[in-house]
Amino acid sequence: MVDEVIQSIERQVQKEKFARKLGLRLIKAEPGYAVVEMEPQEELMNIFGMTHGGAIFSLIDEAFEVSCNTHGTVAVALSVTVTYHRAPDQKSKLRAESVEIHRSAKTGTYEIKVTDERDILIASCTALCYRKKEKLPFLEKTETGG
């Protein structure tokens, strides 16, 4: 079942228009864990020519979204606290790694780190999700052949 959940999430991320628009790529997903990368794009630069904080937040949020939903039930964000440590180099690919540090029946806590290609810390985040008691809707479609 775990493999089916991960594969279904991977398919959903590939279809997610927002992720495609930002160039977000899911690199790895496991229960409670995800790695997402983003290539630098001119469209994502701020007025100073650096990757916009909103784009970095979106990278964090994508990794968080994947990691907290890998258990097969719908999980939604309750709180996301981001600290920006430094601006990335203009041409550096960014990588967000989300790690589950606590999970209960109702909530999950995740630490997400964004690093550049030289493994320099760009941003860090602590995020809390609420776990609903419903299966991921796209899993039901897979199980029924839809």
Question: Which residues does each predicted region cover?
Answer:
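Terminal targeting signals and extreme-terminal segments of soluble enzymes
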Residues: M1-G146
